[in-house]
Structures are given as C-alpha cells and as structure tokens.
Amino acid sequence: MIRGQDPAWIWSRYWLRDQHDECLTDALGLAGLWRDYLSAFDDGARLLDLATGSGEAAEAAADTARKLHRRFDIDAIDSASLPEDLVKRMRKLGVRMMGDIDAAALPFEDGGYDGVFSQFGIEYAARPQAFLEAARMLRAGGRGLFVMHHRESVITRTCAMRLASHRNVIGPTDCFASARKLFTSYLLGGSPTFLQQAETSFRNEVAMLRVRLGEPPADPNLVPAVRFLTEIAVAPSRFDPADALKRLKFAQEDVQSWRLRQEAQQAVALDAPDLDAIRGWLAQEGLDVAPPEIVRDNNGDIAAWALRFHRPALA
C-alpha cells in the first residue's frame, strides 16, 4: 500500500526521485532578500533553517558567511529522510542537515538561535505548532524570515498546470494495476488463457498511455515510468515476476510522490488571511512581526510571501 497521506513519506520518497522541482532563488527574485537578511548576522551567529528541503536557504547562509569572512553555526532540519549524498555535501559547506525532524516538535532548547528562517517549507508543517516552535527557537534580539508560497504565485499556477497535464495523461485506466495483476498471476501460476488476456489488456493500456503522453511529452515527469511500462509490456514473460512487481511498486511510488508533492503545494499556498493568522501566532509568542511583503520574480510575477520578525532585545 502506498502511504500517500503521510507528509513525511511524500517528501522522503520525493527525494529518492532522479528529478526534482527546484524553487530557484535567483530566478524568483529571492537572492537579494536572503542576502540582506543573512548578511546582518554577526560572526558566530547560530542559525536554524526549518523544513530545509534541498537546503537552498541553508546553503545561501553558508555562502554569505564565506563571502563575508564570517562563521555561522547553521542547523537545517526537515521532516523527510534526506538523501545521504545531500547531507554530506551540505556538511562540507558547514551546514548540519538533519532529517526526520518535525518542525512542529523541535528537539532544541528555547532561545537557542540568533536566526530562524525557512524558504517554501514551514507552511507545509502543522499549524500553528510549527510557527510557535519557530518562535520558541529565537533568542532575545534574534531575527527571522519566512519565504512562503503565495496562492497567486507563478509557482502555484505552474503546479496547477502540471497537475492538469498529469491527470490528462494518466487518464481513466490504471496501467500499474493491470501490470500488478499480470505479474501476480505469473507468480501464482495463472492459466495460459488468463495470462494471454491479461497481457493483451496490459499492452493495450500502455499503448493508450503512450498516445496520451505524446511527443514532446505532455508530462515529462511520467517519461521514466512510461518507458519502464513499455519495456515490460513488449514481452512480459521474459521478466522475473517478483522482480517486476518490486520495480512496479518503485515506479508507481515515483509517480505518486511527484503528484502528491504538487498537490501539497496547492494545499499550503497562502492568502492574506493566512498571513494574518501566522502573524498572530508569532506575536502571541512575544515576537514583533512586520507586515507581509509580496516578492516578485525577475518577470514581475508574484513569487512568494516574505514575512520578517524579531524578538525584542532584553532591556
């Protein structure tokens, strides 16, 4: 069974994919925002990146420290099980990247950080708990910045278009179910007549899927899965049934994790009332919260919300 409703599973499985969607900081007009925020920290500052994902914001912090000849103590957490090669790469940059940590239940002491930030991450975590936890992390005089998905942003619109294309290609049939039925029958020794019928049905469904995918592909994210389904549909009997079922499970999870990732973005994209609620949660924890800013990309389109906050210094 695919655990599609488990948010941590969605992200953990998503990072196993060969291809990932990236929120490119420069193209979205975010580089200057992060540069201004991060360059204001003193040498030795402790920083926490929440729901770090691929670590773009944490990497920006490390890069800022290097360019300014400063040392930042950077922690970056995510609820997903992060790829080991990503963790190692970030470690070389001076970032402690830690997976399997829920932003809504942080294992760190109160007021342990000079800076708390997130880029397209914290809005995916449980509300209001994740925002209350973020406030708890910030020491007196500390500053925070959240860059979050906007409901009218170019990212949100792009995700909606991708999902529509994906659903059109997948269509009314389920090639994966047909393939599982076929190879399970092989494994259990189904009758020749049944196997022949199952092979024909599976082969026809794959052919229709290929037509809907088209060339150039209407949904590039489906290309690896369709290529695999085409391969096993040509001569299914050549494949070991147990191995084929294992590969089918992986391919289906690959497709589903991408779809759930896009659906999650649509669900968490924020409007103005959402920002008002977040500001209220942070304020109740003693933070001073600035009015939200709308960040625009290099083309002038809405890219994100930016929310700045700080904990007043002790008198």
Q: Locations of the language-model features?
A:
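Class I SAM-dependent methyltransferase Rossmann-like catalytic core
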Residues: 1-42
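Class I SAM-dependent methyltransferase SAM/SAH-binding core
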Residues: 46-48, 53-105
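A short acidic, Gly/Pro-enriched loop at the edge of an enzyme's catalytic core
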Residues: 104-116
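A short SAM/SAH-binding and catalytic strip from SAM-dependent methyltransferases
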Residues: 115-128
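A short glycine-rich, Lys/Arg-flanked "PGG" loop and its adjoining helix->strand segment in the class I
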Residues: 129-140
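Conserved class I S-adenosyl-L-methionine
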Residues: 145-175
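Substrate-binding/catalytic lobe of Class I Rossmann-like enzymes that use SAM or dcSAM, i.e.
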Residues: 176-288
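Core SAM-dependent methyltransferase catalytic element
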Residues: 286, 295-315
